[in-house]
Amino acid sequence: GVMYIGNNKGLLEFDGNSWELHELPSRNIVRSVYIGKDGKIFVGSFEEFGYFERNSLDSLVYHSLKDEVKDFQFHNDEIWTITSAHGEIVFQSFGSLFFYDGHTVKGIRTKTLPLNLFQVGDTVYSQQINGGLFILAKNGLENLIERKSLGNSDVVAGLPYNDGVLFLTQKSGGFVYQSGKILKWHTECDAELEKYSVNRAVMTKDSCYIIGTLSNGIYAIDKKGRLLWKENTDSRLQNNTILGLYCDADNNVWAALDEGIAYIQNNSLVYYYEPPYRKIGMVYDVLVKEDEAYIASNQGLYRIRNRVPELVPGLEEQAWFVGEWGKQILCGHNK
């Protein structure tokens, strides 16, 4: 098969032997990728979305759908998720939903702010920013579960669990939703998942839950909550921030990291395309002073004294900026 991966340069295509980059006309970042049943490769970017399709020469050609949206004013709409629902392709930004039926595109501003979209079976769910969990019905978003019932945390993934659904939250672990009831899903690593912030999750064909975190790599957990394995920069991962996960037809796991890609052969070794070990993470900004330095990275804000980096307490996870204002150190942080 062929893998398609979005990155800062465009759409990457990997056939098992070689990589090929397909740029958008705007050369913007590709934030989201979805393969339609008709083979079209849908992609989302900043105020841009559309699809790649092969021509008669077997080359991928991009078709924009943005200009097909009528009576809609774009305003910083970045497409973070693409899925299908009720026979349509759905593109999601933090304030809008766009529906493509194969011919026309309709854009709507949502009353609440969708953080994501994810599909379990035939149902599409959507976590709302600072709100509860909704389902995407034919007539729009409908409230399903109040935020307080899910640990007052954002649901970042939903996966099949027996006859129900396992919802994984960013900071409060997992919850099983079945027959209208919600039960806590207990694991051997609940404390770690809550500490390191769950960001993505997929399920393998042998019902293993692969859970990616923002600051401590990947956990593999079975249905009973037993930890099967864990990978981070202390073992073999080159980066601890997991931005995407995918289980392929051979039951292998692909992880999109903040810096590079990891390929995990199930029950085997991990192979990397960018192998350097950097526990401090991907550096976004640096502030140098006389006797110390500060580094803002995807793992947090670090203070370096005598060549020893120390994570500043309370500023774990992604730190985007560090600067000095008078005698104060300012940090732009994901929190």
Describe the role of every protein-language-model region.
Residues 1-335:
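Carboxylate-rich, polar loop motifs that coordinate divalent cations or form catalytic acidic clusters
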